[in-house]
Amino acid sequence: MYKQTVVIFLLCFFICVSCYEVPPAKLEAIWPKGLRVSLPDDGYSLFAFHGKLNEEMEGLEAGHWSRDITKSKGGRWTFNDKQAKLKIGDKIYFWTYVIKEGLGYRQDNGEWTVTGYVDEAGNPVAPTSQPDAVVTEPPAAITPATAIVTNPPTSQNTYPCEISVSMVSVPGFVCKGQLLFEDNFNKGIDKGNIWTTENMFPGEPDYPFNVYLYDNVHVRDGKLIITPTTLESKYGEDYVRQQLDLTQRCTGTIGTADCTRVASGPIILPPVITSKINTKNRFSFKYGRVEVRARMPTGDWLIPEILLEPRDRIYGIHSYASGLLRVACVKGNVEYSKTLYGGPILCDSEPYRNVNLKQKIGFDHWNKDFHNYTLEWRPDGISLFVDGEKYGDVTPPTDGFYGDAKKENVQAASQWLKGTSMAPLDDYFYISIGLDVGGVHEFPDSSTKPWQNKATKAMLNFWNNRDQWFPTWFKDTSSLQVDYVRVYAL
């Protein structure tokens, strides 16, 4: 079957006249024999049906029926099996798949029971006997007499699955355990399709010492790879003292420091190039389980960013007022690389910045190999796992995060009272993956750090000390490498 590198799976949508919907498949038992499965044409380029009769599907197996339909007819995408011999009480287990505007949408765990028949035109019929091919009796609860007068259901009164508390950024409902998002990075990143590649200067609140460009992210051997390089390696020696204008392709706010920087005196251009990608424009969700298999980078002052970021920032746009969720982070310095941490950040600075983060000390350096990092985000808390082992829980107090934050003079705390006890972590978030360098909050000041966080010359001092940190960066080990990203409904 046609395979997409990136798929967003959403199923069983409500009818909504003002918004996009993916309709449920319509199944019909044809008298005296036949099965018809159809969807209304909504701009699809492919419709696939996979099903089994009276036997549950094993995951995404092909099934007894396995067919790709590449053309619609009469305004519908239709699969027909004119030889199928169905009886009242038969149950069909199925899943369907459509491609619309280059994106794949799958309807999982479908179940449909034969309660009546229609003719080829779709008109209900009331046969006086079961089809000739029926060789087994109907279930005890359904007799031929009652089956004859049973009308096909005219509306869907129950959900076809147990509903999840997870929500996605399109109308509809989500089933428990449903795979909502997956990218195995088997193909290159299509800019603007699922992932948006940042092209901008990152700024507050952490002010990292890098610029995000398209150049430093690519896919190789089924892995997403984000590599740090110096600005001089692209633009020439001493370019940190020049001007860099990204306006033409900038993904930040045009006319601001997001898109244009001019060096002046001790204020230099960010001396390192990295990359960052996100799903903000295509996929966001509320509550779920995020799984990322990744290898963290090795090298001084490197910070891998595997995050969930707030889509609408309804509680404020500054100082992480609307929250940030770290799926996992291992800093690149040798002295830090045995420490894994993850969880929520609700303030840009201490003492409240890291209070809710959970840590796990490894027997070895986490960046020596790939690991599975998981964050489970629920309406009542957060759990963190590595390679299937839980290493931390974050549960809001009875008054939410507000009480503790207020004690630490977090300005945004009062805004959280507008939400649930999980506020500000109770709205839609999107996935972002990137690599940062240095900055003014991630590393505490020390005698071995070449800059002071509050110093005006912080970035310049970092750059002037490059003979110390740059030799710790290697092409094969200083990149953030991601094998896959998956999001499941709770």
Swiss-Prot record:
<dbReference type="GO" id="GO:0045087">
    <property type="term" value="P:innate immune response"/>
</dbReference>
<comment type="function">
    <text>Plays a role in the recognition of invading microorganisms activating the phenoloxidase cascade. Binds specifically to beta-1,3-glucan. Binds the Aspergillus niger cell wall component alpha-1,3-glucan, a fungal pathogen-associated molecular pattern (PAMP) that activates the host immune response.</text>
</comment>
<dbReference type="InterPro" id="IPR031756">
    <property type="entry name" value="BGBP_N"/>
</dbReference>
<feature type="domain" description="CBM39">
    <location>
        <begin position="20"/>
        <end position="119"/>
    </location>
</feature>
<keyword id="KW-0325">Glycoprotein</keyword>
<feature type="signal peptide">
    <location>
        <begin position="1"/>
        <end position="19"/>
    </location>
</feature>
<dbReference type="InterPro" id="IPR013320">
    <property type="entry name" value="ConA-like_dom_sf"/>
</dbReference>
<dbReference type="InterPro" id="IPR035806">
    <property type="entry name" value="GH16_GRP_C"/>
</dbReference>
<feature type="domain" description="GH16">
    <location>
        <begin position="152"/>
        <end position="490"/>
    </location>
</feature>
<dbReference type="Pfam" id="PF00722">
    <property type="entry name" value="Glyco_hydro_16"/>
</dbReference>
<dbReference type="InterPro" id="IPR050546">
    <property type="entry name" value="Glycosyl_Hydrlase_16"/>
</dbReference>
<dbReference type="GO" id="GO:0004553">
    <property type="term" value="F:hydrolase activity, hydrolyzing O-glycosyl compounds"/>
</dbReference>
<dbReference type="Pfam" id="PF15886">
    <property type="entry name" value="CBM39"/>
</dbReference>
<feature type="glycosylation site" description="N-linked (GlcNAc...) asparagine">
    <location>
        <position position="372"/>
    </location>
</feature>
<dbReference type="GO" id="GO:0005975">
    <property type="term" value="P:carbohydrate metabolic process"/>
</dbReference>
<keyword id="KW-0399">Innate immunity</keyword>
<comment type="similarity">
    <text>Belongs to the insect beta-1,3-glucan binding protein family.</text>
</comment>
<keyword id="KW-0391">Immunity</keyword>
<keyword id="KW-0964">Secreted</keyword>
<keyword id="KW-0732">Signal</keyword>
<dbReference type="GO" id="GO:0030246">
    <property type="term" value="F:carbohydrate binding"/>
</dbReference>
<dbReference type="InterPro" id="IPR043030">
    <property type="entry name" value="BGBP_N_sf"/>
</dbReference>
<protein>
    <recommendedName>
        <fullName>Beta-1,3-glucan-binding protein 1</fullName>
    </recommendedName>
</protein>
<dbReference type="InterPro" id="IPR000757">
    <property type="entry name" value="GH16"/>
</dbReference>
<dbReference type="GO" id="GO:0005576">
    <property type="term" value="C:extracellular region"/>
</dbReference>
<comment type="subunit">
    <text>Monomer.</text>
</comment>
